[in-house]
Regions:
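Residues forming the flavin
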Residues: 2-83, 117-456
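Dinucleotide-binding Rossmann-like beta1-alpha1 core, especially the glycine-rich loop
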Residues: 64-115
Length: 456
C-alpha cells in the first residue's frame, strides 16, 4: 500500500495544471499522478507517421501523459463562449480569471509564445448575412509541434518539483473504506497494488467515460447524460478559407439546417494541416492537426462538421450510439476511416481509388475510399450536406466536387455527475476536465485543474 496526500488519476491538461497549482500552494504536499498511457516523450503512433493504425491496446494519441491535447492542434480558447460550460458553473468573471491564468502559465513554459488571434466584425457580419453564426473568441494557437515541447517543459517542472508521475498505470477501482481516505486499485505493467490518498482528483478525459460511470455507480452519484456529436472531417485547398484563417485563425461557425432545423457546427479548423486517425476504445475515427513549423504545412486545410444529438427518454446511451455509427464506418473501411469526394456523395456513388487518384485535393490521410451515405443516418447526413452548402456562401469552393469527407468523426462527452461548487462529487473526490462533462477543450480543462487546486 502506497500513501499520498493527493492522487490525480489522469495526466492530461486538467491533471497537470491541478498538480502545478497544488505544488505552488503546498510545497511539501505529496502528490502522485497516474496515467494508463506512456510518458509524453515515449508516445509513438504509427498512424501519425503516415502508416496504418495498428490498434494499440492503449492509443498513443488519445492516452498518455499530457492527454489527448498533446497531439492536438493546440488551440487555446481565451474565452468562455465555447469549449465547455465553466462560466455556467463559476460565473464568467471567475472562469475567465482561471482561463487567463492558464494562458500565463503556458507562456512561462513555451518558447516563442504565439500571438493572440482576435475576433473580426467583418467576418461575423458576412456569416450573419448568410444565416450562419461565427462564434466570438480570442484564440492562442500553439500548433501540434510547439504544444508538445511546451507540455514537456511543464512535465519536467513537475518532476523536478518532486511530483511523482507514474505512466502505464491504470486505475481499475476506487473505494472509500473509511471516511478519512480513498483506496485506488492500480495495475502497472501487469503488477497490481493500492494507493491510499486523502484527496483524489479524477481527470481521465473523454476516454475515461467508463471509469467515471464506474465511480458514479460505486459511490451512488447521480449523473445526467450529455449530447454527442457525429459527423465528418472535411478537407480542401487551404486557399478557400484563407480570408478567415489569416484574420482569426480558427473559424468556429454554427449553422441551423433547413430541413430539420438542427444545429451543426464547424470547428477544429487546421490551416495547412493534415487529417489524422485516432483510436477511441478500439474504434478508428478522424481528426485533424496542424503545425507551427512552416516546413510542415500542407496546401490543404481541414475542419470538422458535426451534428449535435440530444436524446430524450427513454434512451440513455448516447455515447454507445455514436460509437456504433463510427464502428460501422470502420466495418465498411476494412478497419480504417473512409473517405469520399463531396461530388460523389451528391451523385449517390461511392468514391473509388481511381477517382480519388484524379482528385485535385490530395488526401493527407491514408483512408479507405468509400461511401459515407452507407454509414451516417439520413438526418445527420442531410445536416452535413446542407452545412457544406451554407459554408460555401461565405467561403466559395467549400462545396467543390473535390472536397473530401472523412468518416466518421465523433465527439463523446462524459456523463455529468452531480457535484458541488468545488466540483466535488463526494467529500475529497473531485472530477475535472472533459471527463467531468463540463469542459470540452484544453483551456477550460486546465482552468478546472487550477480551480480545484484552490479548493483543496
Amino acid at each position: 500500500m502506497r500513501n499520498t496526500n493527493t492522487l490525480i488519476i489522469g495526466g492530461g491538461m486538467g491533471g497537470l495544471f491541478a498538480a502545478f497549482h497544488l505544488r505552488s500552494r503546498y510545497p511539501n504536499m505529496d502528490i502522485i499522478i497516474i496515467d494508463k498511457g506512456a510518458m509524453l516523450k515515449d508516445r509513438k503512433c504509427p498512424a501519425s507517421m503516415g502508416k496504418a493504425c495498428v490498434h494499440c491496446k492503449t492509443c498513443a494519441i488519445t492516452s498518455g501523459v499530457a492527454g489527448s491535447g498533446a497531439f492536438s492542434d493546440a488551440k487555446f480558447n481565451i474565452g468562455t463562449a465555447y469549449g465547455g460550460t465553466l462560466s455556467e458553473e463559476l460565473g464568467d468573471d471567475v472562469a475567465m480569471n482561471y482561463i487567463n491564468q492558464v494562458d500565463k502559465i503556458l507562456e512561462g513554459f513555451s518558447e516563442n509564445y504565439p500571438k493572440m488571434f482576435e475576433s473580426n466584425e467583418d467576418l461575423k457580419l458576412k456569416c450573419v448575412q448568410n444565416n450562419l453564426r461565427l462564434l466570438d473568441m480570442n484564440v492562442r494557437h500553439l500548433g501540434t509541434d510547439r504544444n508538445a515541447v511546451t507540455m514537456q517543459h511543464l512535465i519536467d517542472y513537475l518532476i523536478d518539483n518532486k511530483i511523482e508521475i507514474i505512466d502505464h498505470a491504470d486505475c481499475i477501482g476506487l473505494y472509500k473504506p473509511v471516511d478519512e481516505y480513498f483506496v485506488a486499485e492500480v495495475v502497472e505493467h501487469n503488477h497490481q497494488y493500492n494507493i491510499q490518498a486523502d484527496n483524489v482528483i479524477v481527470a481521465t478525459g473523454r476516454g475515461g467515460a467508463d471509469f467515471v460511470k464506474k465511480i458514479c455507480n460505486e459511490f451512488d452519484i447521480e449523473s445526467e447524460a450529455n449530447a454527442v456529436d457525429v459527423g465528418v472531417r472535411v478537407e480542401m485547398k487551404d486557399i478557400i478559407w484563407k480570408e478567415f484563417s489569416d484574420k482569426i485563425y480558427e473559424p468556429k461557425i454554427l449553422c441551423k439546417t433547413k430541413t430539420f432545423e438542427d444545429q451543426t457546427r464547424m470547428f477544429c479548423f487546421n490551416q495547412g494541416g493534415i487529417v489524422s486517425a485516432e483510436n477511441n476504445r478500439g474504434i478508428i475515427t478522424a481528426n485533424g492537426h496542424s503545425f507551427a513549423d512552416p516546413t510542415k504545412k500542407t496546401e490543404n486545410c481541414n475542419f470538422a462538421i458535426l451534428s449535435s444529438i440530444h436524446f430524450t427518454e427513454p434512451f440513455d446511451q448516447p455515447t454507445e450510439y455514436a460509437e456504433n455509427v463510427s464502428r460501422m464506418a470502420n466495418m465498411i473501411g476494412n478497419g480504417n476511416v473512409i473517405v469520399q469526394r463531396f461530388g460523389d456523395l451528391i451523385r449517390g456513388r461511392r468514391t473509388n481509388e481511381h477517382r480519388l487518384s484524379q482528385n485535385t485535393v490530395r488526401p493527407t490521410l491514408n483512408a479507405t475510399a468509400g461511401d459515407i451515405s452507407l454509414v451516417l443516418p439520413h438526418r445527420i447526413l442531410t445536416n452535413i450536406i446542407e452545412t457544406i452548402y451554407a459554408l460555401d456562401k461565405v467561403a466559395p469552393g467549400t462545396a467543390n466536387d473535390d472536397t473530401l469527407l472523412y468518416g466518421c468523426e465523433s465527439k463523446y462527452y462524459s456523463l455529468k455527475p452531480k457535484h458541488n461548487k468545488n466540483f466535488e462529487v463526494i467529500p475529497g473526490l473531485y472530477l475535472i476536465g472533459d471527463g467531468s462533462g463540463i469542459s470540452r477543450g484544453l483551456s477550460q480543462a486546465a482552468a478546472m485543474g487550477l480551480y480545484v487546486a484552490d479548493q483543496i
